[in-house]
Amino acid sequence: MSVAGTFNSTSSDFDSVTPLVWGPAGQSLAFALALRAGDAVLDVCAGTGASALPAARAVGPDGIVHAIDLADDLLEVGRVKATAAALRNIDFVCADATEWETPSSVPDGYDALSCSYGIFFLPDMDISFARLVRLVRPGGRVGVTVWRKGAVEAFGNAFFDVVARYAPDVAHNGPRSRSNYDTNPIRRVETADSLAEWLQSEGCSDVQVQELSNHVPATEEFVWNFVLGSGFRGALSNFDESTTLAIRREFGELLTERGIDFVDATTLVATGVRTA
């Protein structure tokens, strides 16, 4: 299943995780970008708007946020949220980030670029993100969030151990997958130093990286919502309902057996300034 297909299938589950995971990181990213009234913001891999909606509130009625993603079902949730919040300065657009161009309404380039938990899903992280950075005006701000090294690791190991009981050779390419683990792009940006170096190589200066500590209680409801509402869901795409239910039950049992009481969702929040 494609990345867009995986996330389209998770729209309601994805958003159920927002208050505990995507939301805190998105709010932190919008704050770290020091957005100002009237700014034009490009939010990439926007999902249901975890970082785009706080950005829209920050830039006010004279600003604009273009929130793009390949998963239109997720974007529709964001549109509903924006309408409910009376935010008229945000457009949720189903579009490919690798092809997005600055519209005529933003003639001087974006004032800020944000991407929360999305850079490792880009088809070529280095080339694709460098291109997006060039859509920002010189002196504009660039910000990303990524999992910190070790985050979600114990959770993911337990999940894939259970999945392997039913499909030892299942392929899954999410950022916490074991397939091609050492070559996954996230390996190059999961520490403060490596993330800062990477942003500098992408055309940013004055890079700052902060750690957002987030440990979510591993309740039965949350752990399964997190599986279904994230890239982990892709590993379940070939299983029927009865097998999925068995995996859910055994996964919960294994978390208890291993003493995993919290899900470590610690995140790195990085910002920089686009160089001339």
Residue ranges and their predicted role:
Residues 1-37, 50-54, 77, 96-99:
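Conserved class I S-adenosyl-L-methionine
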Residues 3, 48-50, 184-276:
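Conserved Class I S-adenosyl-L-methionine
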Residues 38, 61-62, 136-142:
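Short glycine-dipeptide loop
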Residues 40-102:
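Class I SAM-dependent methyltransferase SAM/SAH-binding core
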Residues 59, 82, 163, 199, ...:
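Conserved hydrophobic residues forming the short capping helix/wall of the S-adenosyl-L-methionine
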Residues 98-113:
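A short acidic, Gly/Pro-enriched loop at the edge of an enzyme's catalytic core
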Residues 112-126, 148:
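A short SAM/SAH-binding and catalytic strip from SAM-dependent methyltransferases
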Residues 126, 131, 141-216, 234:
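Conserved catalytic/acceptor-binding region of the Class I
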